[in-house]
Amino acid sequence: MAWVVAYALMLNSMLNNMQQMNTDAIAYMRIAEYWSSGNLGFAVNGYWGPMLSWLMVPFLWLGVEPLLAGKLAMLFSGAIFFHGSLFLVRSVGLRLVDELIVAWVLALTIPGWMSNHVTPDLLVAGLMAFALGQAVSPDWLANRRRALGTGATWGLAYLAKAVAL
């Protein structure tokens, strides 16, 4: 039930705060436009992680305005953070009541963050939560598939924001 409320609040918050953005949003939207047009000379850079811009590209190909594409990417980032955080809570073995509390806190706080920013922070945090949830598994070292999945998730987090390195 909390995820339904979270998604509804995130969507409502996104629609009601379309014109609000931070300064980084302009850079990410511009880089997404470079990726969507195949201008790799400007798209590839050493400062901005590509993942958030990549999430915007399919929307740009469909003719969506860059600001809406950025907000939709943030909606996806909020979902990744929500589910990644719950995966981590489950992985460390907290009780069901603790998981429900975390789910409701996330459902009520994520919309406020994602509606005012176009930034990879939620995306990288969600991917890191997924990676940490995999890493705390008792069979992490014994299960090659889990170890590779953990490494791949950390790699995706790095593509979202270099701080994950």
Regions found by a protein language model. Give the residues of each.
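Short acidic/glycine- and proline-prone juxtamembrane loop motifs at membrane-interface regions
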Residues: 48, 113-124
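Transmembrane-helix signature of polytopic, membrane-embedded enzymes
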Residues: 83-108, 125-126, 144-146
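Extracytoplasmic catalytic/substrate-binding loops of multi-pass membrane glycan-assembly enzymes
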Residues: 15-31, 43-55, 64-65
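Membrane-interface transmembrane helices that cradle and orient dolichyl/undecaprenyl
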Residues: 91-95, 129-147, 157
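Short helix- or helix-capping micro-motifs
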Residues: 3, 99-109, 129, 133, ...
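Transmembrane alpha-helices of multi-pass, membrane-embedded glycan-processing enzymes
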Residues: 48, 52, 56-64, 70-84, ...
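Transmembrane helices and adjacent periplasmic/lumenal helix-loop junctions
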Residues: 148, 152-165
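Transmembrane signal-anchor helices characteristic of membrane glycosylation enzymes that use polyprenol
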Residues: 1-22, 107-109, 157
